[in-house]
């Protein structure tokens, strides 16, 4: 049994096992992590990170290194990636989480207690400012524009060809 789709007299049959349900980006399978505990990236914020050996280092068909070199470099890549990541997270995760918490707490506080009250105050004052601006426009700017229009309406240009 396969997947059948029809479009413009074309049929496509695929096996369910070989059919990839995602397009291009290799998303982590949530069921795969159900046994290991919580999914640490439930919103798939870092699904674009491809740090596998084959995604970083690739040899074209015309230039291959020795098999032992390829195997050793693959092993060293994976081990160093694992060890360095663990080392960096031990020393950087807690301080960076602390700094990010302070930053987001500060931004949230500023947004809640300063920015939104300021925006609401401006929105409350805008109808009054609009009324005052309309009055200033009607009293000062409209007569100036009317008199300038009348003055320039009496100007006539004549072009002569000499």
Swiss-Prot record:
Residues 1-86, 108-162 are cytoplasmic. Residues 87-107 dip into the membrane without crossing it. GO terms for biological process: caveola assembly; cell differentiation; endoplasmic reticulum organization; insulin receptor signaling pathway; mitochondrion organization; negative regulation of endothelial cell proliferation; positive regulation of dopamine receptor signaling pathway; regulation of cytosolic calcium ion concentration. May act as a scaffolding protein within caveolar membranes. Interacts directly with G-protein alpha subunits and can functionally regulate their activity. Acts as an accessory protein in conjunction with CAV1 in targeting to lipid rafts and driving caveolae formation. Positive regulator of cellular mitogenesis of the MAPK signaling pathway. Required for the insulin-stimulated nuclear translocation and activation of MAPK1 and STAT3, and the subsequent regulation of cell cycle progression. Phosphorylated on serine and tyrosine residues. CAV1 promotes phosphorylation on Ser-23 which then targets the complex to the plasma membrane, lipid rafts and caveolae. Phosphorylation on both Tyr-19 and Tyr-27 is required for insulin-induced 'Ser-727' phosphorylation of STAT3 and its activation. Phosphorylation on Tyr-19 is required for insulin-induced phosphorylation of MAPK1 and DNA binding of STAT3. Tyrosine phosphorylation is induced by both EGF and insulin. Keywords: Cell membrane, Cytoplasm, Golgi apparatus, Membrane, Nucleus, Phosphoprotein. This is Caveolin-2. Belongs to the caveolin family.
């Amino acid at each position: 049994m396969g997947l059948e789709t029809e479009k413009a007299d074309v049929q496509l049959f695929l096996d369910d096992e070989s059919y990839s349900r995602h397009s291009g980006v290799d998303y982590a399978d949530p069921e795969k992590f159900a046994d290991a505990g919580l999914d640490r990236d439930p919103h798939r914020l870092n699904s674009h990170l491809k740090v596998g050996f084959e995604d970083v280092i690739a040899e074209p068909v015309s230039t291959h290194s020795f098999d032992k070199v390829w195997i050793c470099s693959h092993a060293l890549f994976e081990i160093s990636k694992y060890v360095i990541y663990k080392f960096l997270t031990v020393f950087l995760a807690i301080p960076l989480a602390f700094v990010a918490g302070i930053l987001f707490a500060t931004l949230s506080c500023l947004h809640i207690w300063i920015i939104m009250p300021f925006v609401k105050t401006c929105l409350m004052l805008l109808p009054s400012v609009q009324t005052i601006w309309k009055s200033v426009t009607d009293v000062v700017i409209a007569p100036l524009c009317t008199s300038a229009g009348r003055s320039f309406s009496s100007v006539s240009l004549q072009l002569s060809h000499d």
